[in-house]
Curated annotation (Swiss-Prot):
This is Alpha-1A adrenergic receptor. This alpha-adrenergic receptor mediates its action by association with G proteins that activate a phosphatidylinositol-calcium second messenger system. Its effect is mediated by G(q) and G(11) proteins. Nuclear ADRA1A-ADRA1B heterooligomers regulate phenylephrine (PE)-stimulated ERK signaling in cardiac myocytes. GO terms for biological process: adrenergic receptor signaling pathway; adult heart development; cell growth involved in cardiac muscle cell development; MAPK cascade; negative regulation of autophagy; negative regulation of heart rate involved in baroreceptor response to increased systemic arterial blood pressure; negative regulation of Rho protein signal transduction; neuron-glial cell signaling. GO terms for molecular function: alpha1-adrenergic receptor activity; protein heterodimerization activity. It is a multi-pass membrane protein. Keywords: Cell membrane, Cytoplasm, Disulfide bond, G-protein coupled receptor, Glycoprotein, Lipoprotein, Membrane, Nucleus, Palmitate, Phosphoprotein, Receptor, Transducer, Transmembrane, Transmembrane helix. It comes from Mus musculus (Mouse). The lineage of its organism: Eukaryota, Metazoa, Chordata, Craniata, Vertebrata. Glycans are attached at residues 7, 13, 22. Residues 1-27, 89-99, 168-181, 298-305 are extracellular. It comes from the Eukaryota. A lipid is attached at residue 345 (S-palmitoyl cysteine).
Amino acid sequence: MVLLSENASEGSNCTHPPAQVNISKAILLGVILGGLIIFGVLGNILVILSVACHRHLHSVTHYYIVNLAVADLLLTSTVLPFSAIFEILGYWAFGRVFCNIWAAVDVLCCTASIMGLCIISIDRYIGVSYPLRYPTIVTQRRGVRALLCVWALSLVISIGPLFGWRQQAPEDETICQINEEPGYVLFSALGSFYVPLTIILVMYCRVYVVAKRESRGLKSGLKTDKSDSEQVTLRIHRKNVPAEGSGVSSAKNKTHFSVRLLKFSREKKAAKTLGIVVGCFVLCWLPFFLVMPIGSFFPNFKPPETVFKIVFWLGYLNSCINPIIYPCSSQEFKKAFQNVLRIQCLRRRQSSKHALGYTLHPPSQAVEGQHRGMVRIPVGSGETFYKISKTDGVREWKFFSSMPQGSARITMPKDQSACTTARVRSKSFLQVCCCVGSSTPRPEENHQVPTIKIHTISLGENGEEV
């Protein structure tokens, strides 16, 4: 994946000094390519900072996006500057050894970027198909392993030419040509593009099928909210488990609660955003991976030098446009980008009116507002309150927990109820409520906050039970 093809090097295998550079052409190319490189570097840095500075974006999916941005940042900062100089001067000015290293890093970064998109497509399929099981299927440990596999496979594909898997290099060190050895071209094209592309297309086709099927289910008469958060509802009735010294009234022997399945809207929006990323990736890289194998196996069908350069830089363009796609397609990234650009990163403190958080503690302490024994769980750690609706003066919130076992601990006296309470703070709304319906053992038995799936919480404006 080096800029100059063999077409461009034919007749150039000589040792005399290169021709004089055309100044006007060099300035024009320098401005265009330099602007593209700066835009790509700054844009990918912005993506990384947006995730790093916003804890609600600290999820495995967004870590995959950061990995994609890191690969693109490495490409735009370490490979593209030399590609631009190569294009402007018309010859390679850095020697044979650096040419080989530069070409290997080029393949490494491009392959890591493409495989990163492949991992993201698999992640989105799991998120849309298994939204409730997603936190247990896609864990941070598995995410790290997936990213390590991405970079390991990318390294394997990129280092072949460094160990001699390439055509014989020309004697003139001012020529740094693409590796057109047929075996390596086939291997790299399959591993770097066609296999990941097949996986990406299959995953997104399945995402589309699942999303379409679920949307039909929601429209077929199942109970839904009339708000933006249309959801499937499963109503469950069961008796309370009696507890010694429980402060809960014995009259409430039956608990009526709703377990709402997450609608696919958030997952579908993320899939849509990443679908646009994949679409742009195909448009940018497919021409190159069509031209390169054809030119390697059928030399008589090599495209003109100008066409090859355009196709090659079109592939580079993909690493520069991803930062444009995120804010245009995702409200989360749009707000995160704005915060970073306004230098508001990490300025959200607990006392801020924009803070969102909740505290788990025994019910008796919830009423008094005490802080002893409370467990502060930050937003972005996997536990989130979603505002469902506001009708007739009632605010309804959904509590979703993907808390890993042992991630938070709390000790409760034996005379306390197994009911866990949550204090919600969002702008001017501050209430104390009770989450019911957990089927896990009482907290005092294992000294852990129960792993709560999904609960709906209905409160009046003054916090009264609804």
